[in-house]
Amino acid sequence: MRLCDRDIEAWLDEGRLSITPRPPVERINGATVDVRLGNKFRTFRGHTAAFIDLSGPKDEVSAALDRVMSDEIVLPDGEAFYLHPGELALAVTYESVTLPPDLVGWLDGRSSLARLGLMVHVTAHRIDPGWSGCIVLEFYNSGKLPLALRPGMLIGALSFEPLSGPAARPYNRRQDAKYRDQQGAVASRIDKD
């Protein structure tokens, strides 16, 4: 059962759930909290690699990822990031979220953006119990026109679902937590699997 708006506010008031900066009540809807786009992005560079062997030796996978991923792009206030048709880019939420070990979160993109061809998360929409940090967005433009994305715009909504009990291995306590405390548009760390 997902938390309703009253429960989300209560969990925030009690400090059981943290969203920084705290959203105003107008952005806490029936069962979701609106989140905004941050100013950090990462793209794929022009490259000549025919493929990346994701099950290859870890050092080769790491080197291939370094060749194709850009450095982090930090946009100044007021500037737009342009996502062209058929392009994938990483970005982050403006808000940082911390979940307790007995709560899982879900990120959904906005329907208004999906109707323009923008996928806000390609596959990874679960936010694990114990997560703390900004949420990386996996943008894909499946539409016909370039889209101008501006930091601060509403980009998605979070919902929260209590677990039957606290997780024994919440994300923030796992030794293999590759994206712990991320604040930027962190590239894939599949080579750490």
From Swiss-Prot:
Its EC number is 3.5.4.13. Signal peptide: none annotated. Pathway: Pyrimidine metabolism; dUMP biosynthesis; dUMP from dCTP (dUTP route): step 1/2. Gene3D superfamilies: 2.70.40.10. DCTP binds at residues 110-115, 128, 136-138, 171, 178, 182. It catalyses: dCTP + H2O + H(+) = dUTP + NH4(+). GO terms for molecular function: dCTP deaminase activity; nucleotide binding. It comes from the Bacteria. InterPro entries: dCTP_deaminase (IPR011962), dUTPase-like_sf (IPR036157), dUTPase_trimeric (IPR033704). Keywords: Hydrolase, Nucleotide metabolism, Nucleotide-binding. The active site is at 138 (proton donor/acceptor). Belongs to the dCTP deaminase family. Homotrimer. Catalyzes the deamination of dCTP to dUTP. PANTHER family: DCTP DEAMINASE. This is dCTP deaminase. The lineage of its organism: Bacteria, Pseudomonadati, Pseudomonadota, Gammaproteobacteria, Enterobacterales.
